[in-house]
A protein has these predicted regions:
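Short hydrophobic-aromatic micro-motifs
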Residues: 67-69
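Repeat-mediated protein-protein interaction surfaces in helical alpha-solenoids
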Residues: 116-120
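Short alpha-helix boundary/capping elements
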Residues: 127-132
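Long, amphipathic alpha-helical surface segments
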Residues: 1-63, 72, 79-81, 87-105, ...
Length: 184
């Protein structure tokens, strides 16, 4: 894993500069969190950003969750996004990278079978949208870890609701994730 993007993001969050002590501490974090498996490709990032969109002013996602940038709900420091928050394009990209890293680590930890890059990217989009807990407790993951790739693919389509209601945007997103997961 190249650490330059991580440290670039940390510099933005810190206001431009890092002390040597901060660099040393961040190096320890990188060593612990560096994914031991796959990372999201440009195809996966494009899928995520095409459905998330980009908003530089915090907004309610329709079910009471304040969101900013490319769908970020918590900043890298753990603080939740709230009404009135704003960000720059560079900050939005930093938040996206931070969120993706967390979800990549989770996917690499939870999935026990080989994945193609397309399958990983589809899972990255799914997990970015729904969170690690939903992936961890899903029938999708259970089927996948039993090498039932088709059954896992079909499970994407189940996750099309927000606030108990079927959402057209989620139907489209799950169909796109399923198609990518099955793509050779």
């Amino acid at each position: 894993m190249t650490t330059k993007p991580f440290f670039d993001a940390a510099r933005v969050i810190a206001g431009g500069k890092l002390t040597q002590a901060q660099v040393d501490d961040l190096n320890k974090v990188v060593e612990k969190l560096a994914p031991s498996g796959k990372t999201t490709s440009d195809v996966g990032i494009d899928l995520i950003t095409s459905f998330e969109g980009t908003r530089f002013n915090a907004y309610d996602d329709g079910v009471g969750v304040w969101t900013i940038g490319f769908g970020t709900i918590k900043y890298p420091n753990g603080v939740r996004v709230k009404k009135g928050d704003t960000c720059t394009e560079q900050q939005a990209e930093t938040y996206l990278k931070n969120d993706l890293t967390k979800f990549e680590v989770a996917i690499n930890k939870l999935v026990k079978v080989p994945l193609t890059q397309n399958q990983f990217d589809a899972l990255a989009s799914f997990t970015y949208n729904l969170g690690e807990t939903n992936l961890a407790n899903s029938t999708l993951l259970k089927k996948l870890n039993k090498s039932d790739y088709q059954g896992a693919a079909d499970q994407f389509l189940v996750w099309n609701r927000a606030g108990g209601k079927v959402m057209k945007g989620l139907v489209r997103r799950r169909e796109a994730e399923r198609a990518l997961f099955l793509k050779k």
